[in-house]
Amino acid sequence: MSNQNQSTVFTPSSSTLWGRLGGGSFLPDVLAILFFVAVSVVYFIVPIRDGLVLTGHDHTGGVGSGVEMEQYRATHNGERTRWTNTLFCGMPTYQMSPSYRSTETLSTLERVYQLGLPGLSAYAAYVFMMLLGFYIMLRAFDFRVWMAALGAVLWAFSSYYFIIIQAGHIWKLLTLSFIPPTIGGMVLCYRGKYMLGIVVTGFFTAMQVLSNHVQMSFYFLFVIGLMSLAFLIDAIRKKAFARWIKATLSFAIGGILGVCINVSNLYHTWEYSKESMRSKSELTQKTKDPADQTSSGLERSYITMWSYGIGETWTLLVPNTKGGASQLLADNKTAMKHAKSDFAPIYRAFTQYWGEQPGTSGPVYVGAFVLMLFWLSFFIVKGPMKWCLLAATALSILLSWGKNFMGFTDFFLDYVPMYDKFRTVASILVIAEFTIPLLAMMALKKVVEDPDCLRGKEDGLPRVHYITVSFALTGGMALLFWLMPDLFFGNYISSSDQMYMQQYVSAGYIPQEMAGQIMDNMSEMRRAMFTADALRSFIVVAIGTALLLAYRSGKLKSTPMVAGIIVLCLVDMWGINKRYLNDGMFTRPKSNEQAFPQTDADRIICQDTDTYYRVLNLSVSTFNDNTTSYYHKSIGGYHPAKLRRYQELIEEHLQGEMSRINSAVIESAGHLEDCPGDSLFPVLNMLNTKYVILPLKDNGKLPVQNPWAQGNGWFVSGIEYVPDADAEIAALHTADLRHEAVVDDDFADVLGSEALQSDSTATVELTSYEANRLAYKVKSQKGGVVVLSEIYYPGWTCTIDGEPTDIARANYVLRAIKVPAGEHEVVMTFDPQTVHITEAIAYTALALLALMLIGLLAYSLYRKKHSL
């Protein structure tokens, strides 16, 4: 091959996709895209034909928590509220409905990019976008059409992506689908297509950020940084440093434009993060282990709860290395062939999975032959890009081990900015799922373009040994797993299995003398699952290697070889993915009313004519459920990044009070007025908890009214100022919250230090309610401090008779204002000015990107016209 073909930095020829912008046929690319459409549709053909849908927890929860936002938008000409009161007594919607008018154009372009597939099947559209994104990147790398199509299949059909579709993690998947074409824009910049690179980078960065999964975008900054380093090393070797600077600036401009188009979302996500669970607590006397705390984020144990096991990493080659998913063991046909009939019913109490994670929806499997090609790249792909991609692969695997490799993880938690903001470290394996197929395709590209790379000798050794070693590291290991599984893995029993078995024995469900026999049989069943998959992976690698050897010997041309590999890998990965996303998981679509059936308890509570109150639902997992939010303003809810102070209030006060109010309902036969409510559950009262829903037998639910709820607001006769958060949250245990307010010293200037006078005639009445605007009529003879049962958050503004006034934080989480004597209208509004400022920036960036695209198209047409 020529030096130009080996170069990392070059100007694409007119034979590439990008070269054709100046002329040439796009037909091969169109055919590849049609192939992607066909593959995506066929995978979901049964759900498409029958009109079936998935019902993921995240989706259902999103509907429940988002109902107030949708109602607001429908009644306010498409305007969006940035606040909702449906869960956790109120929180911003920045991480629930992060859509802004400036991104509506992007949403339209996304629908165009999807070729209308969502109208047929949203799930097919997701897979199509994964395929198309990687294809665009490989075409930017100058891969031929069908080679790029193969690479797209290798990336898009990695098992994890189908698993997250099933789980409903759609934002994550969309973000991942836009990452490869963003990197494609970077490649174009470094290959001399500066303006096109800026436009491609800008557009796909904007789409990626719009998809709103910061964790995935953050992880791929490691990849982008290492790839940029590879281009730098190549430029230094070729004495083209100035060109590297120009390319880097071009890529940066594109990235900045894409980020600026989404600046509204990004800024408010950052602003919210400072108040969320993802930020450092102000409490210093927490009972949690100080060594478990990170400098500015979540607890280490929480971040690393889902850590990939070191041995579990073999799932990249053999998917059932640790049993696959946390599905019932009794549902696995291979396992049940080895089950003893006496124990068969017991296996409905255990799962197939025996790994270190608390549970999993499935393994990360990149394809057995893909992994073989990845190892082949180690020997035949030259240049710094290979080493940087290998480094990224190793980094992702080491970090995915989390608590199983804690020294390395601690270093990143302590010294890498933002790394401690994200949990589920196992998900960083998405980097390996990107680099492995990319390096595999670089190896195959080398084989196709330079067949001699596998012939003859290098440094005195036959090059065919590159295939031999790569086969040994994949097919050979799979064969060993099949022949001698116990040499690598012990008894196929997890610590969770042992714990559950001990519980069953202690409860008398399983005799002690049978426990060991059951465990032995379970090991045999799981061993059978593992060895069956090991043999399967060996066969896949063997077939793929045979295709390579046939091409090397001249018995097979490159086109049929590539076609054979496409079929092999598609069949292999398709079969694995169908384990975790199959037709049986789809159901008939339900309306929201069917998904959230209104219970008798809901109907009774909804008959209340009060404008605004809150409901505590004890019949569900209160703080892991959003169904209550569909009909009520809930004390609970579900969100992975709730407000930090509210989470601390849950831990310090609400959990205990929930138990006490439950007992009080039982002891008083539902007559809570007969119990000392202000001493038993004062914090629930200050949150205006007017109703409690309790579980009954046969899934029934009982609504109980709480007469101790303090309403929407009240005057207090005293303020207890405290020096810090520790004292503030502790004082809620002893303060008379009906008549006193606990306030941090920082707000003394807002509420004043003069003595307050009691006024039995003072009233606070809510006169108007909207999610982001609350109006009150406040009457008093003496004036004073009013505490409102609303969650304090920066960005809320308040006026008294139209004049602005400051808001203080009281009782750890609530709002308080100082009101003069007389009758006044108090209005609370959440319309942050930062939204308007960031929207102006976003529109400017969008206009600049559009102008660049228009200029690029005009230049291409001009060049085409004058080349005729």
What is each PLM-predicted segment?
Residues 308-398, 435, 447, 451, ...:
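Segments forming glycine/polar-rich beta-alpha architectures that bind adenosine-containing cofactors
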Residues 138-157, 195-198:
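Transmembrane-helix signature of polytopic, membrane-embedded enzymes
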Residues 12-97, 276, 289-301, 372, ...:
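Hydrophobic alpha-helical membrane-insertion signals
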Residues 28-66, 255-268, 395-398, 477-483, ...:
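Transmembrane signal-anchor helices characteristic of membrane glycosylation enzymes that use polyprenol
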Residues 39-134, 141, 153-176, 294-366, ...:
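Membrane-interface coil-to-helix junctions
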Residues 168-179, 189-206, 214-216, 220-255, ...:
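Contiguous transmembrane helix-bundle modules in multi-pass membrane proteins
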Residues 74-99, 108, 321, 331, ...:
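Extracytoplasmic/lumenal acceptor-recognition loop(s) of multi-pass membrane glycoenzymes
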Residues 67, 372, 636, 690, ...:
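Active-site-proximal, structured, solvent-exposed surfaces of multi-pass membrane proteins
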